Amino acid sequence: SICIAFYLEKHHIHTTLYDLSKENIRNAKSAGLQVMERNILSDDGDTMTEHASQLIALTSSNDVNIIACRKFNSIFGDKNVFRLVTVNEIKLKALSRPTDILFSADSDYIKLIELVRKYPDLKEVEITSSNQLQNLLNNNDDYIPILIRRKNKVLFINVDFEYYYQ
């Protein structure tokens, strides 16, 4: 989450990280990011939404991510609340897939962390065609397509992502 927040800040998109982990807080602050030591599920969570327009839940806890999305869905709307897929959602194909899943149907916390450790910086790729975009979205064993930035707008990629190259 720190590398994503750092990328967004670099492109003038304000972020605030919420965490209780002293190590995560220290790492975020050393990267120059705004971070709050606070439980996002606490009752005073509504005060945290004053300047926010999206929630991206990227904790190692599936339960925290799911509950945070449920809590903030009514505030931000279902198009602005995202979380990682759970291992059970990957394994049990019979489960209906929620639409708030980030990145892809198989990008869980473990895959995200393994790729971030291997490649700590986000790589920006210029898209020059529809075919190139589809290939990037569909062939992602060694990377996770995270977002599309066009001018001053950022779209996070989720399982129901539809974007047409223009």
Where is each model-derived feature located?
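Cytosolic regulatory regions of ion transport systems
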Residues: 1-166
